Regions:
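Gly/Ser-rich oxyanion-binding loop with an adjacent helix/lid
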Residues: 1-20, 26-39, 73-77, 83-196, ...
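C-terminal nucleotide
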Residues: 1-25, 50-83, 179-323, 338-378
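Short Gly/aromatic-enriched secondary-structure transition segments
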Residues: 37-44, 223-224
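Short, charge-rich binding segments
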Residues: 42-44, 52-55, 101
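Short, amphipathic alpha-helical segments that act as regulatory/interfacial helices
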Residues: 45, 94, 228-231
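A structural signal for short, well-ordered beta-strand segments
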Residues: 109-111, 207-209, 335
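FabD-like malonyl-/acyl-CoA
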Residues: 125-126, 334-338
C-alpha cells in the first residue's frame, strides 16, 4: 500500500513526502456502555490508513484518495465544506485544529487504507487520526494525544454529522501493539492490558455478515433513553455503578423493556472488569465465556442483534470457539471471535459454508492483530 501511495504521489506532485499512519480498531468487550458512563475495552489493529504528506507552500490542501481514485482541493480559509464525503474528514481535522489556535498551511497528500468499510472497525477514525497526528507533527503544534482524539470526534460531529463517542478515535490514537485499553468513559482515565492471543495459542478473527438491517425509528436513541430513565429512577446520572440489587429494588417502578435494557448494561460493566482480571491471569476461557454472555445479552435483553449474527455466534459455539459476540452497535455487521489456533480452519470453513447455505452468501473473514495506533512511518 505504501508503494502504491508513493508512486501516485510522485506522479501527481513530482516530489516525495513523509508517511504517517493510524489504525482501525476492535472492541473486545464493553458494548453500549460508553454513553452510560462505563468502560470500553478497545485495541488498535493491523488494518488502518496511510498518508504521504508534504507541505506545498500555499494555503491550499490538495488531496487524492487512492482507493476511490478521487481528487479534491480546498483553501484553508474557505468556509464551504467539500462535497466528497472523504474530503470532509480532512477538511474537518484542519478546521478543528485551526479552531484550537493551531497555525497550519497548505499541503499535498495521497492516502489509502485497508480497514474494511462497513465492518464497524472505524475507518473514519483512522483517517481523522492519521491527519490530526500528521499535522501536529509537521507543524509542531504540541497538541496532546487526548486532544488529537477529540479533534477526530469533533470532525465527525461538526462536518460529517455523526454524533459518535470518543472510543474509536481514542483507540486509533492511543493504540499499542499487544495491548488493549480499558477506557473509563466517565473520567477518561485509561489503562493498558497485555493482550497477546497469538502467544497463547489463540487467534482473533472477525466475521462480517455483510448485513445491515434498515431500522424504523431511532433504535439507538430508544435504548439510550431507556438507560437514562432507569438511571433517573435510581437517582444517578448514569447507569454506571448501579448494581443488580438496586435494579431489582426498582423493578416495579420501570417498564419491562427498560428493566431488560438496564440489566444488560449493568451486567456488561461487570463483564469488562471480569475480562480485564482474567487477562491478567492469562485466563482466555473466562474471556471467551464473557464474550458469549455479552452476545446473548445484546440479543435478548438489549435487542440489538439480528438473525444472521445470532447464527454466527451459535455456529461458533458449536465449533468449540472460545468466545464470540456481536461487535459494534448491532443490527448487522460483524462478530468478533476468539478461537484456538487448532480449531481455526475448521471453524472458518464451517461458518462460511453454513452461512452461505442459509443466507446465500459467505461472511467475509477478517483476521486481526493488535497493533500500534497513530504514528510516523520510516
Amino acid at each position: 500500500m505504501k508503494t502504491r501511495i508513493a508512486e501516485k504521489f510522485q506522479t501527481l506532485f513530482q516530489t516525495e513526502g513523509e508517511f504517517f499512519a493510524s489504525a482501525g480498531r476492535i472492541n473486545l468487550i464493553g458494548e453500549h456502555t460508553d454513553y452510560n458512563g462505563g468502560f470500553v475495552f478497545p485495541g488498535a489493529i493491523d488494518k488502518g490508513m496511510i498518508a504521504e504528506i508534504k507541505l506545498n507552500g500555499t494555503n491550499t490542501v490538495r488531496a487524492f484518495a487512492l482507493d476511490l481514485d478521487e481528487y479534491c482541493e480546498f483553501g484553508l480559509n474557505e468556509e464551504d465544506v467539500p462535497q466528497q464525503g472523504w474530503a470532509r474528514y480532512i477538511f474537518g481535522v484542519c478546521r478543528e485544529i485551526q479552531k484550537r489556535g493551531g497555525e497550519i498551511a497548505g499541503f499535498n497528500t495521497v492516502f489509502a487504507g485497508d480497514v474494511p468499510l462497513g465492518a464497524g472497525m472505524s475507518s473514519s477514525a483512522a483517517l481523522e487520526s492519521t491527519f490530526a497526528y500528521a499535522l501536529n507533527e509537521l507543524f509542531n503544534l504540541g497538541i496532546d494525544k487526548f486532544e488529537l482524539a477529540r479533534i477526530g470526534q469533533s470532525t465527525e460531529h461538526n462536518y460529517v454529522g455523526v454524533k459518535c463517542g470518543i472510543m474509536d478515535q481514542f483507540a486509533s490514537v492511543f493504540g499499542k501493539a499487544g495491548h488493549l485499553m480499558r477506557l473509563d468513559c466517565r473520567s477518561m482515565e485509561f489503562e493498558y492490558f497485555p493482550f497477546a492471543p497469538d502467544q497463547n495459542g489463540y487467534k482473533v478473527v472477525l466475521l462480517n455478515s455483510c448485513v445491515k438491517h434498515e431500522l424504523v425509528g431511532s433504535p439507538y436513541n430508544d435504548r439510550r433513553n431507556s438507560c437514562e430513565r432507569v438511571a433517573k429512577v435510581l437517582g444517578q446520572e448514569f447507569l454506571r455503578g448501579a448494581t443488580m440489587e438496586q435494579l431489582e429494588a426498582v423493578k416495579d417502578q420501570i417498564s419491562e423493556e427498560d428493566y431488560l435494557r438496564a440489566r444488560y448494561v449493568i451486567g456488561e460493566e461487570q463483564r469488562v472488569l471480569d475480562v480485564c482480571e482474567a487477562l491478567g491471569k492469562g485466563d482466555y476461557e473466562t474471556v471467551g465465556a464473557r464474550m458469549y454472555e455479552t452476545h446473548w445479552g445484546m440479543s435478548k435483553d438489549y435487542e440489538v442483534s439480528c438473525e444472521e449474527l445470532d447464527f454466527l455466534a451459535t455456529v461458533a459455539k458449536e465449533c468449540g470457539v472460545t468466545g464470540s459476540r456481536i461487535m459494534g452497535g448491532g443490527f448487522g455487521g460483524c462478530t468478533i471471535n476468539l478461537v484456538k489456533e487448532e480449531l481455526y480452519d475448521a471453524f472458518i470453513e464451517k461458518a462460511k459454508t453454513a452461512f452461505a447455505e442459509k443466507y446465500g452468501h459467505e461472511p467475509i473473514v477478517i483476521p486481526v492483530v493488535i497493533s500500534d495506533g497513530a504514528r510516523k512511518l520510516a
